[in-house]
């Protein structure tokens, strides 16, 4: 009888034991030995950001007005938009200016970094799109600094929900950034006979800028989330929808590829971009895109692109462009019997939220890190760390040309698989020791009532129901999903694994974050950190690590398009790559990043930590000149900051 009773309850005992094992497994996922010891090597101090005069008097919101069909999920619809960028907006040589979107006011704020010296400070201001048409059905989503008309002056592209991006082109003869110092231009011409906007209703959450066709000029790829519809119009048509699947959605806003065509400088500067139809395979151009990144994986001066999509497959797009024609082909990772389906690059069903390229293992090749939703007991996917398996750029080209992506997914062995509801993610070397850290924004909707059960119930529903917003669970002010998750700061331990030390560093503020930007704002070689928070003020952290290594900081320019202003160092060398070899044989590759990720844009300097390396290092430079000709050179450079002008050769000029 006792044996029968034991047999009858054994399934329950097994289930309890399984749950206990799972608890300890999940607990171990986010706990790596050595976190406290590693954290002692870092230190950050938050500094106050200066705002425009009277900014504190502006009304502050905590929710958006949305289409009536979205009202029941308006907190979900209101969950994005905070973004931040750090760059050299003054033109003085140091990246110590900030541009950020504050969703509380729906304003774009331009100010100086708290670390900026007096000479680089200016009156903070709001970037007003007038006289271009804008109304309550539109909202800014991102700042993307860049020199779009190639005149040597830093411009700003602002992306939006509800319209195409606006370019704020810096006028000649203006000394410091100010609202009146910029000429406004639609990125694509729009007719407005009545002063109202009648153009495409893009809903942009991602942008990357690079020379994609190899002509020496910066092209722009826009990633849109919602399809064209009245998302933010409470009086709009009932034309809105949600994703038609949680894993294979194809009804998103997708990609827009814009090829640089022509530009002028002066008091009314201009630039012309041409839409490049068919640049991306149709099946890869209709996703719910949240992040974009690009890097030259093959050494041809043609950057490949990673597309991070919500609700459907991510995509790695191999660049097969020629001057005047941008073209990408989709490539896929290999899958063995032991590879989970979603760990095959380009075939995953996870929620791609952020992406960055960097040389994680310091072997001279670009790896990739991708944010997903990885909340234990909530929605537990895995972040991606795609480690490059190609032995050389030539081998990478051979694989990609055959349609194969030479990457394997290593997030779990490296300790970065699980963190929370991920968004923007960035590589950076905050200690200058030659090892990259990974910073990731986290959190979704902050409130008081836990709504994870509703979300989990929806995740198990039939895909045929999902596109109708009425079938989604309520998500209103007061509801909470992952609302108390602080950003993650992954640092490498002695074992080679990474561990999240955000709590030890005091960065564990329980507010959802969206964008990350890094820059050497003090010209000391230490990368500072700026963070955009959703429905809260952004934060700026100065890097006070106690024992910094040597570094190489390269400011890379090409001559301006007209070459007339001798007071300007030049225009950023979009697409330039740098490989540094130290005396011990260690190789690191990096690039001038013209803009990547989700809600954050790092500065343009190419920063590499050298650790304890002594003496000059070997620097391999590869770039295209303004005519599109590809050049490369190898030279010795000492540690520190160097300003280099790239033509058909390399000329070092004094740092500004």
What are these regions (language model features)?
Residues 2-75, 79-83, 482-485, 492-493, ...:
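Gly/Ser/Thr/Pro-enriched helix-cap/hinge segments flanking short amphipathic alpha-helices
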Residues 14-19, 145-175, 183-185, 199-228:
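Hydrophobic or amphipathic alpha-helical targeting/insertion segments
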Residues 53-83, 131-143, 190-208, 251, ...:
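Repeat-based blade/solenoid architectures
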Residues 80-91, 110-111, 139-154, 203-218, ...:
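Beta-propeller blade termini
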Residues 201-212, 216-221, 348-449, 511-548, ...:
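Repeat-solenoid scaffold signature
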Residues 224-250, 371-378, 444-481, 562:
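Short, conserved, GDST-rich strand-edge loop motifs in beta-rich repeat architectures
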């Amino acid at each position: 009888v006792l044996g029968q009773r034991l047999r009858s309850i054994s399934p329950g005992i097994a289930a309890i034991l399984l749950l206990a094992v799972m608890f300890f497994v999940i607990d171990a996922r986010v706990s790596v030995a050595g976190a406290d010891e590693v954290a002692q090597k870092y230190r950050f101090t938050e500094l106050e950001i200066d705002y425009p005069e009277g900014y504190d008097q502006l009304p502050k919101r905590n929710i958006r007005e949305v289409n009536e069909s979205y009202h029941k999920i308006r907190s979900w619809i209101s969950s994005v938009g905070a973004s931040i960028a750090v760059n050299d907006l003054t033109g003085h040589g140091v990246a110590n200016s900030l541009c950020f979107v504050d969703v509380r006011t729906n304003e774009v704020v331009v100010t100086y970094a708290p670390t900026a010296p007096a000479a680089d400070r200016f009156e903070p201001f709001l970037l007003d799109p007038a006289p271009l048409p804008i109304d309550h059905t539109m909202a800014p989503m991102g700042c993307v600094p860049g020199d779009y008309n190639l005149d040597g002056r830093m411009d700003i592209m602002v992306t939006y929900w509800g319209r195409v991006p606006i370019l704020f082109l810096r006028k000649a003869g203006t000394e410091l950034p100010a609202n009146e110092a910029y000429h406004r231009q639609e990125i694509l011409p729009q007719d407005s006979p009545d002063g109202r906007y009648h153009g495409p209703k893009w809903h942009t959450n991602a942008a990357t800028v690079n020379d994609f066709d190899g002509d020496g000029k910066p092209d722009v790829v826009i990633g849109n989330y919602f399809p064209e519809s009245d998302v933010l119009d409470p009086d709009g048509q009932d034309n809105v929808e949600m994703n038609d699947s949680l894993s294979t959605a194809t009804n998103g806003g997708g990609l827009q590829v814009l090829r640089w065509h022509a530009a002028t400088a002066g008091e009314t500067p201009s630039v012309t971009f041409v839409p490049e139809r068919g640049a991306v395979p149709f099946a890869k151009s209709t996703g719910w895109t949240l992040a974009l990144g690009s890097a030259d994986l093959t050494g041809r001066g043609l950057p490949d692109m990673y597309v991070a999509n919500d609700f459907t497959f991510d995509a790695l797009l191999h660049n097969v462009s020629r001057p005047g024609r941008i073209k990408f082909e989709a490539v896929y990772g290999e899958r063995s019997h032991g590879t989970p389906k979603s760990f095959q690059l380009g075939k995953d069903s996870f929620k791609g939220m952020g992406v960055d390229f960097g040389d994680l293992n310091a072997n001279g090749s670009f790896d990739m890190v991708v944010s997903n939703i990885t909340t234990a007991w909530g929605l537990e996917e895995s972040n991606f760390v795609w480690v490059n398996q190609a032995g050389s750029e030539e081998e990478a080209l051979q694989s990609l040309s055959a349609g194969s992506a030479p990457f394997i997914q290593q997030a779990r062995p490296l300790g970065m698989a699980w963190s929370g509801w991920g968004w923007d993610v960035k590589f950076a070397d905050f200690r200058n020791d030659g090892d990259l850290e990974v910073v990731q924004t986290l959190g979704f909707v902050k409130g008081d009532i836990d709504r994870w059960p509703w979300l989990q119930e929806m995740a198990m529903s039939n895909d045929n129901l999902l596109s109708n917003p009425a079938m989604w669970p309520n998500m209103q002010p007061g509801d909470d999903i992952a609302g108390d998750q602080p950003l993650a700061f992954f640092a490498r331990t002695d074992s080679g694994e990474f561990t999240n030390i955000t709590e030890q560093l005091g960065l564990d503020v329980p507010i959802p974050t969206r964008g990350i930007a890094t820059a050497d704002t003090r010209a000391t070689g230490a990368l500072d950190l700026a963070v955009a928070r959703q429905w809260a003020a952004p934060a700026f952290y100065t890097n006070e690590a106690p024992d910094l290594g040597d570094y190489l900081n390269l400011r890379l320019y090409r001559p301006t398009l007209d070459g007339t202003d001798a007071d300007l160092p030049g225009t950023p060398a979009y697409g330039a790559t740098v490989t540094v070899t130290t005396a011990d044989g260690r190789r690191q590759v990096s690039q001038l990043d013209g803009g990547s990720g989700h809600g954050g844009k790092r500065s343009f300097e190419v920063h590499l930590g050298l650790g304890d390396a002594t003496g000059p290092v070997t620097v391999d430079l590869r770039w295209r000149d303004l005519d599109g000709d590809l050049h490369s050179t190898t030279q010795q450079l000492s540690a520190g900051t160097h300003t280099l002008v790239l033509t058909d050769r390399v000329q070092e000029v004094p740092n500004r």
